[in-house]
Amino acid sequence: MIFFISDLHLSPRSPGATRLFLQFLAGRARQAEALYILGDLFEAWIGDDDIDDPYHAEIIAALRDASAAGLVISLQHGNRDFLLGTDFAAATGIRLLSDPYVLSTAEWQFVLSHGDALCLDDAAYMAFRNQVRNPEWQAALLAKPLAERRAIAAHMRQVSESSQQGKENPYTDLQAAATDDFLREHGYATFIHGHTHQPAKHDHIVDGIHVERWVLADWHEDRGECLVWDGEALTREALTLKNRP
Protein backbone atom coordinates (compact mmCIF):
# COMPACT_ATOMS: atom_id res chain seq x y z
CA MET A 1 0.00 0.00 0.00
CA ILE A 2 0.97 3.60 -0.59
CA PHE A 3 -0.41 6.50 1.47
CA PHE A 4 -0.71 10.14 0.37
CA ILE A 5 -1.31 13.08 2.71
CA SER A 6 -0.88 16.86 2.58
CA ASP A 7 -1.73 20.14 4.25
CA LEU A 8 -1.34 19.14 7.88
CA HIS A 9 -0.09 22.66 8.76
CA LEU A 10 1.46 21.40 11.99
CA SER A 11 2.46 23.95 14.61
CA PRO A 12 2.35 24.36 18.39
CA ARG A 13 -1.03 26.03 17.79
CA SER A 14 -2.45 22.74 16.45
CA PRO A 15 -1.90 20.17 19.24
CA GLY A 16 -4.75 17.94 18.05
CA ALA A 17 -3.49 17.63 14.48
CA THR A 18 0.02 17.11 15.81
CA ARG A 19 -1.06 14.26 18.08
CA LEU A 20 -3.08 12.73 15.24
CA PHE A 21 -0.01 12.78 12.98
CA LEU A 22 2.17 11.21 15.67
CA GLN A 23 -0.44 8.47 16.18
CA PHE A 24 -0.64 7.94 12.43
CA LEU A 25 3.13 7.56 12.10
CA ALA A 26 3.32 5.13 15.00
CA GLY A 27 0.36 3.05 13.86
CA ARG A 28 -1.59 2.99 10.61
CA ALA A 29 1.17 4.46 8.44
CA ARG A 30 3.46 1.52 9.19
CA GLN A 31 1.10 -0.82 7.37
CA ALA A 32 2.10 0.92 4.13
CA GLU A 33 5.23 0.50 2.06
CA ALA A 34 5.51 4.22 1.41
CA LEU A 35 4.11 7.54 2.59
CA TYR A 36 4.06 10.63 0.38
CA ILE A 37 3.58 14.02 2.05
CA LEU A 38 2.63 16.48 -0.68
CA GLY A 39 3.44 19.78 0.95
CA ASP A 40 2.61 21.89 4.00
CA LEU A 41 3.52 19.34 6.62
CA PHE A 42 4.29 22.39 8.77
CA GLU A 43 2.43 25.67 9.07
CA ALA A 44 5.83 27.33 8.81
CA TRP A 45 9.46 26.26 8.54
CA ILE A 46 12.06 28.99 8.91
CA GLY A 47 15.18 26.93 8.30
CA ASP A 48 16.84 23.69 9.28
CA ASP A 49 18.77 25.44 12.06
CA ASP A 50 15.43 25.44 13.94
CA ILE A 51 15.55 21.65 14.01
CA ASP A 52 16.27 21.44 17.75
CA ASP A 53 13.15 23.35 18.75
CA PRO A 54 11.33 21.00 21.19
CA TYR A 55 8.15 20.97 19.12
CA HIS A 56 10.01 20.16 15.93
CA ALA A 57 12.22 17.62 17.69
CA GLU A 58 9.22 15.46 18.63
CA ILE A 59 7.95 15.34 15.05
CA ILE A 60 11.44 14.70 13.68
CA ALA A 61 11.91 11.80 16.10
CA ALA A 62 8.57 10.28 15.04
CA LEU A 63 9.48 10.55 11.36
CA ARG A 64 12.90 9.03 12.06
CA ASP A 65 11.36 6.13 14.00
CA ALA A 66 8.87 5.40 11.22
CA SER A 67 11.65 5.55 8.62
CA ALA A 68 13.82 3.22 10.69
CA ALA A 69 10.90 0.78 10.94
CA GLY A 70 10.90 0.46 7.15
CA LEU A 71 8.36 3.07 6.03
CA VAL A 72 9.71 4.97 3.01
CA ILE A 73 8.68 8.60 3.53
CA SER A 74 8.92 11.20 0.78
CA LEU A 75 8.06 14.88 1.06
CA GLN A 76 7.39 17.75 -1.30
CA HIS A 77 7.62 21.38 -0.30
CA GLY A 78 4.43 23.36 0.18
CA ASN A 79 3.82 27.07 0.27
CA ARG A 80 4.36 27.08 4.05
CA ASP A 81 7.40 24.83 4.48
CA PHE A 82 9.42 25.63 1.36
CA LEU A 83 12.62 25.98 3.44
CA LEU A 84 12.74 22.34 4.54
CA GLY A 85 16.22 21.22 3.57
CA THR A 86 18.79 18.48 3.53
CA ASP A 87 19.52 18.67 7.27
CA PHE A 88 15.85 17.98 7.98
CA ALA A 89 15.89 15.10 5.52
CA ALA A 90 19.00 13.62 7.14
CA ALA A 91 17.56 13.96 10.64
CA THR A 92 14.31 12.23 9.71
CA GLY A 93 15.45 9.67 7.14
CA ILE A 94 12.96 10.98 4.58
CA ARG A 95 13.68 12.04 1.02
CA LEU A 96 12.79 15.40 -0.48
CA LEU A 97 10.94 15.17 -3.80
CA SER A 98 10.91 17.48 -6.77
CA ASP A 99 7.58 19.04 -7.70
CA PRO A 100 6.06 17.63 -9.84
CA TYR A 101 7.16 14.05 -9.29
CA VAL A 102 6.17 11.06 -11.41
CA LEU A 103 5.52 7.93 -9.35
CA SER A 104 5.43 4.68 -11.29
CA THR A 105 4.20 1.51 -9.59
CA ALA A 106 3.85 -1.97 -11.03
CA GLU A 107 0.18 -1.28 -11.64
CA TRP A 108 -0.22 2.44 -12.36
CA GLN A 109 1.42 5.80 -12.88
CA PHE A 110 0.80 8.94 -10.83
CA VAL A 111 2.03 12.50 -10.96
CA LEU A 112 2.36 14.17 -7.56
CA SER A 113 2.45 17.87 -6.73
CA HIS A 114 1.58 20.27 -3.96
CA GLY A 115 -0.63 21.87 -6.58
CA ASP A 116 -0.13 25.57 -5.98
CA ALA A 117 1.94 26.10 -9.14
CA LEU A 118 -1.26 25.67 -11.17
CA CYS A 119 -3.31 28.28 -9.27
CA LEU A 120 -2.57 30.79 -12.01
CA ASP A 121 -5.77 32.79 -11.60
CA ASP A 122 -4.59 34.10 -8.21
CA ALA A 123 -2.11 36.73 -9.33
CA ALA A 124 -1.24 37.87 -5.79
CA TYR A 125 -0.50 34.33 -4.66
CA MET A 126 1.60 33.55 -7.74
CA ALA A 127 3.68 36.68 -7.10
CA PHE A 128 4.22 35.50 -3.51
CA ARG A 129 5.11 32.00 -4.70
CA ASN A 130 7.61 33.27 -7.25
CA GLN A 131 9.26 35.35 -4.55
CA VAL A 132 9.57 32.69 -1.86
CA ARG A 133 10.71 29.99 -4.31
CA ASN A 134 13.52 32.23 -5.58
CA PRO A 135 16.87 30.77 -4.38
CA GLU A 136 18.38 34.23 -3.86
CA TRP A 137 15.42 35.33 -1.72
CA GLN A 138 15.65 32.12 0.31
CA ALA A 139 19.39 32.55 0.84
CA ALA A 140 18.88 36.12 2.02
CA LEU A 141 16.17 35.01 4.45
CA LEU A 142 18.26 32.14 5.82
CA ALA A 143 21.16 34.53 6.41
CA LYS A 144 19.06 36.44 8.95
CA PRO A 145 19.18 35.48 12.66
CA LEU A 146 16.72 32.81 13.78
CA ALA A 147 14.80 35.24 15.99
CA GLU A 148 14.32 37.64 13.09
CA ARG A 149 13.10 34.83 10.85
CA ARG A 150 10.58 33.82 13.52
CA ALA A 151 9.26 37.38 13.56
CA ILE A 152 9.03 37.45 9.76
CA ALA A 153 7.15 34.13 9.72
CA ALA A 154 4.72 35.40 12.38
CA HIS A 155 4.10 38.55 10.35
CA MET A 156 3.54 36.56 7.15
CA ARG A 157 1.06 34.33 8.98
CA GLN A 158 -0.77 37.38 10.34
CA VAL A 159 -1.03 38.91 6.87
CA SER A 160 -2.25 35.60 5.44
CA GLU A 161 -4.91 35.19 8.13
CA SER A 162 -6.12 38.77 7.65
CA SER A 163 -6.46 38.26 3.90
CA GLN A 164 -8.49 35.09 4.45
CA GLN A 165 -11.06 36.62 6.80
CA GLY A 166 -14.58 36.50 5.44
CA LYS A 167 -13.73 34.06 2.67
CA GLU A 168 -15.51 30.70 2.64
CA ASN A 169 -12.43 29.16 1.03
CA PRO A 170 -9.44 31.45 0.51
CA TYR A 171 -7.68 28.97 -1.76
CA THR A 172 -8.08 29.49 -5.49
CA ASP A 173 -8.63 26.32 -7.51
CA LEU A 174 -6.28 25.14 -10.21
CA GLN A 175 -6.64 26.84 -13.57
CA ALA A 176 -8.47 24.47 -15.91
CA ALA A 177 -6.43 25.06 -19.06
CA ALA A 178 -3.12 24.87 -17.21
CA THR A 179 -4.24 21.66 -15.52
CA ASP A 180 -5.10 20.04 -18.84
CA ASP A 181 -1.70 21.06 -20.20
CA PHE A 182 -0.06 19.60 -17.09
CA LEU A 183 -1.90 16.30 -17.49
CA ARG A 184 -0.93 16.14 -21.16
CA GLU A 185 2.71 16.92 -20.37
CA HIS A 186 2.84 14.10 -17.81
CA GLY A 187 1.39 11.41 -20.01
CA TYR A 188 -2.18 11.53 -18.67
CA ALA A 189 -1.05 10.03 -15.36
CA THR A 190 -3.43 10.13 -12.40
CA PHE A 191 -2.81 13.48 -10.70
CA ILE A 192 -2.68 13.72 -6.89
CA HIS A 193 -2.22 17.08 -5.16
CA GLY A 194 -3.14 19.18 -2.15
CA HIS A 195 -3.05 22.92 -1.41
CA THR A 196 -6.63 23.91 -2.22
CA HIS A 197 -8.27 22.34 0.88
CA GLN A 198 -11.08 21.18 -1.40
CA PRO A 199 -10.90 17.36 -1.30
CA ALA A 200 -12.56 15.82 -4.33
CA LYS A 201 -12.04 13.55 -7.31
CA HIS A 202 -12.18 15.33 -10.64
CA ASP A 203 -12.57 13.60 -13.99
CA HIS A 204 -10.76 15.33 -16.85
CA ILE A 205 -11.03 14.50 -20.52
CA VAL A 206 -7.77 15.52 -22.19
CA ASP A 207 -7.29 14.73 -25.88
CA GLY A 208 -10.12 12.23 -25.54
CA ILE A 209 -8.41 10.45 -22.63
CA HIS A 210 -10.03 10.16 -19.20
CA VAL A 211 -7.67 11.33 -16.44
CA GLU A 212 -8.44 11.38 -12.72
CA ARG A 213 -7.35 14.22 -10.44
CA TRP A 214 -7.50 13.57 -6.71
CA VAL A 215 -7.35 16.51 -4.30
CA LEU A 216 -6.10 15.63 -0.82
CA ALA A 217 -7.86 16.83 2.32
CA ASP A 218 -6.36 19.29 4.77
CA TRP A 219 -6.08 18.18 8.41
CA HIS A 220 -7.95 19.60 11.40
CA GLU A 221 -7.63 19.39 15.16
CA ASP A 222 -9.95 16.40 15.41
CA ARG A 223 -9.54 14.64 12.08
CA GLY A 224 -7.35 14.02 9.08
CA GLU A 225 -7.36 11.91 5.97
CA CYS A 226 -5.04 9.86 3.82
CA LEU A 227 -5.48 8.64 0.28
CA VAL A 228 -4.67 4.95 -0.05
CA TRP A 229 -3.43 3.10 -3.13
CA ASP A 230 -3.83 -0.66 -2.65
CA GLY A 231 -2.53 -1.71 -6.05
CA GLU A 232 -5.96 -1.60 -7.65
CA ALA A 233 -7.76 1.58 -6.63
CA LEU A 234 -7.48 4.83 -4.70
CA THR A 235 -9.67 5.25 -1.63
CA ARG A 236 -9.98 7.90 1.05
CA GLU A 237 -9.44 6.86 4.65
CA ALA A 238 -10.59 9.03 7.55
CA LEU A 239 -8.21 9.44 10.48
CA THR A 240 -9.39 10.36 13.96
CA LEU A 241 -7.74 10.88 17.30
CA LYS A 242 -7.63 7.92 19.63
CA ASN A 243 -8.21 8.41 23.33
CA ARG A 244 -5.11 8.63 25.41
CA PRO A 245 -4.33 5.37 27.24
Tell where the protein language model's regions lie, with residue ranges.
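Extreme N-terminal starter segment of soluble prokaryotic enzymes
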Residues: 1-3
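Core catalytic region of metal-dependent phosphoesterases/phosphodiesterases
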Residues: 10-105
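Active-site neighborhood of phospho(di)ester-bond hydrolases with catalytic His/Asp-centered motifs
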Residues: 5-6, 35-39, 72-79, 97, ...
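Active-site-proximal loop/helix segment associated with metal-binding centers of metalloenzymes
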Residues: 115-175
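Short, solvent-exposed aromatic-acidic interface loops
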Residues: 237-245
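Short histidine/acidic/glycine/proline-rich micro-motifs that form metal-
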Residues: 8-11, 118
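A short, polar/proline- and glycine-enriched secondary-structure boundary/capping micro-motif
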Residues: 15, 121-124, 245
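Conserved beta-sheet core of the metallophosphoesterase superfamily
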Residues: 91-98, 109, 116, 121-127, ...
